[in-house]
Amino acid sequence: MSENTFLVEIGTEELPPKALRSLAESFAANVTAELDNAGLAHGKVEWFAAPRRLALKVANLAAAQADREVEKRGPAIAQAFDAEGKPSKAAEGWARGCGITVDQAERLTTDKGEWLLYRAHVKGESTEALLPNMIASSLAKLPIPKLMRWGASDVHFVRPVHTVTLLLGDKVIPATILGIPSDRVIRGHRFMGEPEFTIDHADQYPQILLERGKVIADYEQRKAKIKADAEEAARKIGGQADLSESLLEEVTSLVEWPVVLTAKFEEKFLGVPSEALVYTMKGDQKYFPVYDNAGKLLPNFIFVANIESKDPQQIISGNEKVVRPRLADAEFFFNTDRKKRLEDNLPRLETVLFQQQLGTLRDKTDRIQALAGWIAGQIGADVNHATRAGLLSKCDLMTNMVFEFTDTQGVMGMHYARHDGEAEDVAVALNEQYQPRFAGDALPSNPVACAVAIADKMDTLAGIFGIGQHPKGDKDPFALRRAALGVLRIIVEKNLNLDLQTLTEEAVRLYGEKLTNANVVDDVIDFMLGRFRAWYQDEGYGVDTIQAVLARRPTRPADFDARMKAVSHFRTLEESSALAAANKRVSNILAKSDETLNDIVHASVLKEAAEIKLAGNLVVLRDKLQPYFAAGRYQDALIELAALREPVDEFFENVMVNAEDKDVRINRLTLLSKLRELFLQVADISLLQ
């Protein structure tokens, strides 16, 4: 066993399951940073996390910091002593800070002068002495939104702490962390194994905890076991488990000794829309639903117990009894809701505020209805179906099912609309109006759904910006960033012919006199263009490419995307760097000139062969490229413009732009402005690095 292995384990009460991984990873990152900053050499840093513990193991940790030579330069000699040769206050203060007197200081002489100098050999501190503060500091920096206090102490942490284990090899490092003295005591599983035992050496972790405490401390090992066992359990009943990553992570964080079991529920409940049943199983009970090979929900579920029972059937029966009333509630709500039409819920929307200054959900529904119809007309969707879907868009929020199972909003609207005999694209739109809900989520599948989804999001953006409540910092209570990116994704990926300018103006117009921000249209568009920046950065585009396109402020998202792809391709051309530099040069020349330019380049004033050649090329390209620009063929246009490299280079090599003759000078500046205008039809490539 190595004497250089370090172990820290913080034994707590049950930690928040959704935060367990981030707490453990942050703890590891913080400790690693502390070790690196202190200059302590170390090997691999492993983290462990279970419901009642956070732990780290560091391999090959140096016994002490390396010794180092310290040099601190003091005041110049001229400022260090007065006319009588007595030390100045500045010199005395510097010396005091170094722990010496002025006469003990050395002198440093260079060709620039002479200074006081403190030089010392500093012995590195022992690792044992440094670790307690490092651990305390690392714990204090954990991302804990809400701390709690326990007992009579003033100690705060995410949950009460019961044990602190600090071992360097086989030695306990004396310390008090979070109010608990360090020891070699570790607590095992609450109901299995040894409830408490001592660990002799850091290298024994986590195996000793597994063998004596019946706790799998390795998070990834625990997660892999749950996944494999659940897949096998589902296979045995002829199905496939819905092992969504988020739920798998949460369940992994809830158990120390996972035991996967299979249970069932009554088949009659399968008459309820599967989304409601799944919401209950996954959201409330943390169960894994099971589907057949055709994707149909089976009357079974898989759950994970935290104990290896002598009578597992008793645990299975208990879980079946727990879930049955929830499924019965869903069945009752579903049957009750269908006794009236979805549209009958419209009046009740008047009782729910969307936002105090912006009115009720009924008001929002009217706006969505009108805006969805307008959008449908722009993109060639069925206007009647879009307005109908807009009218019904929020009605399911008033149903019993959605009131009880909030995550079923939208999907229950779809089921109830189908029951009422609404058109299929209307029903689908009620569900897909919220898409995309998150990064990478599917987009609305039909034009009517696209119209309603865009209308809902644009109404929120226009309204909230219209009353001056735009996102600040990381606070975004109305999820405006997600809404903006959702609109952009739908328009770009569905290639819809929509302009943010007219779209925003229409959304704002529907609010009437309710909005107080006179700049709301520009604010919304600027915000959405900012979302474009984030989106394309995530897609791997360079910041300068994005800035080059943003400089033109294109408000048609599909057009913006075409420009981005064109500039990105342009950068791969051999001529791109030279033309970008030339555009930058042209931009600077034009910016420094305050002379009024001509409307056209006058051929009669052209004198040099290089300027005549460039002017001729521009005339040909201008006429050729206008149809390209009109059709959004920006990539083809930039490929053609790349041919200007040679005449542009010749122009700058052979032509004096700022000629003494005013007419010649203005004509040459006009020529350069026409050159720049051609490139600006696509983007400001002078911004390319």
Curated annotation (Swiss-Prot):
One of its GO terms (biological process) is glycyl-tRNA aminoacylation. InterPro entries: DALR_anticod-bd, Gly-tRNA-synth_bsu, Gly-tRNA-synth_heterodimer. One of its GO terms (cellular component) is cytosol. Its main location: cytoplasm. It catalyses: tRNA(Gly) + glycine + ATP = glycyl-tRNA(Gly) + AMP + diphosphate. It is found in: Cytoplasm. The keyword Manganese does not apply. Keywords: Aminoacyl-tRNA synthetase, ATP-binding, Cytoplasm, Ligase, Nucleotide-binding, Protein biosynthesis. The keyword Iron does not apply. It comes from the Bacteria. It holds the Pfam family DALR_1. Its EC number is 6.1.1.14. GO terms for molecular function: arginine-tRNA ligase activity; ATP binding; glycine-tRNA ligase activity. Tetramer of two alpha and two beta subunits. Belongs to the class-II aminoacyl-tRNA synthetase family. This is Glycine--tRNA ligase beta subunit. It comes from Klebsiella pneumoniae (strain 342).
